[in-house]
Regions:
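Conserved glycine-rich cofactor-binding loop
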Residues: 8, 15-16
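Conserved glycine-rich Rossmann-like NAD(P)H-binding loop of the short-chain dehydrogenase/reductase
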Residues: 29-46
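The beta1-alpha1 cofactor-binding region of Rossmann-like NAD(H)/NADP(H)-dependent oxidoreductases
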Residues: 41, 61-73, 105
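Substrate-binding pocket helix/loop in short-chain dehydrogenase/reductase
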Residues: 98-100, 107-109
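Active-site helix of classical SDR
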Residues: 123, 160
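Residue(s) in the substrate-gating loop at a strand-loop-helix junction
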Residues: 143
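C-terminal helical subdomain
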Residues: 184-185, 200-245, 250
């Protein structure tokens, strides 16, 4: 019997990369899942992969920053399964334009909408049900860019992930009295499809040195499997072999690819 047998979880950003790996790992441990992502086709593929591990999986295509979607997902999971034990706020995006001078208002808003507003909305809607149960876990997938500004990750992404760390701390500050725990997981460079959005995507030999999505999924299982009296507040995961990814960014700037435009 898996360590999450009988538990119910919502995972956002579940169609690819870390989110898909998290969904499959939680399903393998017995969890019933509600998966959320923008792209319906890849989301259904991820749902099918999770179903092969056993257990029931519902999929909800849509934008995590849509308040009505967040309400519908939570309502449906409660109506079908009667509980929500875990929320994994994994949905994240970035823009190819990383500098302040390069970034449009639309770029900024899109990154914050997905990376922090979505986490806020889903957290807001699961809280009443977790409070009623007297327990629950919210796991926020951040980044090393949430610990220190990262030029390769960009100003909007770094700022949004710092905000996610603050949201995590606020959840713990306000909700532990209700038995609700929050953990933020901050991975270093991880081989996911989001790397294709970098101004200079890493080469294959560089990808080989990075973390895998399954590494982050294993950390989620570790956090989710802790007893109710244990709170893991933060996990930082880094590749054993550090890579000079700052050099990618410096070459990109030196080649004159920044656009420096204002709305």
């Amino acid at each position: 019997m898996g360590c999450l047998q009988g538990k119910v979880a919502i995972v956002t950003g579940a169609s690819t990369g870390m989110g898909q790996a998290i969904a499959i790992a939680m399903a393998a441990e017995g969890a019933t899942l509600g998966l959320v992502a923008r792209s319906a086709g890849p989301l259904e593929e991820a749902g099918s992969a999770a179903r092969t591990e056993g257990g029931e999986v519902l999929t909800f295509p849509g934008d995590v920053a849509d308040n009505e979607l967040a309400k519908r997902v939570v309502r449906t999971m409660i109506e079908r399964f009667g509980r929500i034990d875990f929320l994994v706020n994994n949905a994240g995006t970035n823009t190819p334009h990383r500098n302040l001078a390069d970034m449009s208002v639309a770029d900024w808003n899109q990154v914050f909408s997905t990376n922090i507003t979505g986490a806020f909305l889903f957290t807001r809607h699961v809280l009443p049900h977790m409070r009623m149960a007297g327990k629950g876990q919210i796991i926020n997938i951040s980044s090393g860019a949430g610990l220190a500004p990262s030029a390769p990750a960009g100003v909007a992404y770094s700022a949004s992930k710092h905000a996610l760390h603050s949201l995590n701390d606020s959840i713990n500050l306000e909700e532990r009295r209700h038995g609700i725990r929050a953990c933020v997981i901050a991975p270093g460079e991880t081989d996911t499809p989001n790397l294709d959005l970098r101004p200079r995507p890493p080469a294959k030999e560089e990808l080989a040195k990075m973390l895998r999505s399954e590494d982050i999924a294993n950390a989620v299982i570790y956090v989710a499997s802790q007893p109710d009296h244990v709170s893991v507040d933060m996990i930082v995961i880094t590749p054993t072999a550090p890579r000079n990814y700052q050099a990618d960014y410096e070459r990109y700037v030196a080649e004159g690819h920044t656009r420096v435009s204002l709305d």
